[in-house]
């Protein structure tokens, strides 16, 4: 079994592309969020566009350049989705959420790497656990949104969301380092992107 250093050396170009694309996409979302006063597209329309793009990226056999364009559109629409949070939180809270997100990302990525060094690999069973946990979280969040007097449940779910997406960073770090993506750096960086932006949203709501 190759060591961590062997894995990183073998995948050095792939990892460089993953983090370069991740930086570009996060920058798009952040720029749109900061410099857009009001989203020209409704929340549910944005969500619909994002779901369609995720399905296409996951299932359609399209070249990397086309995936990059679709990912960039997704990042743009997600940035528009984040604009509404500027109306309920101040700039200081957003700044704290950004720093908290980056700190947690670095910490949990380090945990994922440390587990590999310790010979611990998080397999498909752990990935399934995260998926079903996320599905349950989404259902409970919908209940909290439509229900009256469930503010405490909403706070608890926000805390659970922070923990869950932190665990996703650990899992995705191991997947990116050990799984053969066949050069598909877009999908790998999308996994990190979704972890980071969802962690960011939960931290904003928590503030």
Predicted regions and their residues:
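A hydrophobic alpha-helical transmembrane-helix feature that marks the membrane cores
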Residues: 1-207
């Amino acid at each position: 079994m190759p060591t961590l250093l062997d894995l990183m050396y073998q995948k050095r170009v792939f990892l460089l592309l993953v983090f370069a694309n991740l930086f570009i996409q996060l920058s798009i979302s952040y720029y749109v969020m900061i410099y857009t006063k009001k989203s020209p597209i409704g929340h549910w329309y944005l969500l619909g566009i994002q779901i369609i793009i995720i399905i296409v990226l996951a299932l359609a056999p399209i070249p990397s350049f086309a995936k990059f364009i679709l990912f960039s559109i997704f990042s743009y629409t997600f940035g528009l989705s984040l604009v509404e949070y500027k109306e309920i939180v101040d700039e200081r809270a957003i700044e704290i959420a950004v720093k908290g997100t980056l700190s947690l990302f670095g910490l949990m990525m380090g945990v994922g790497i440390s587990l590999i060094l310790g010979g611990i690999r998080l397999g498909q069973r752990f990935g399934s656990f995260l998926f079903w946990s996320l599905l349950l979280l989404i259902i409970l969040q919908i209940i909290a949104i439509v229900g009256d007097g469930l503010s405490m449940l909403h706070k608890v779910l926000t805390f659970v969301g922070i923990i869950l997406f932190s665990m996703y960073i650990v899992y995705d770090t191991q997947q990116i380092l050990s799984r053969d993506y066949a050069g598909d750096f877009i999908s790998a960086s999308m996994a990190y992107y979704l972890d980071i932006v969802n962690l960011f949203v939960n931290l904003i709501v928590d503030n």
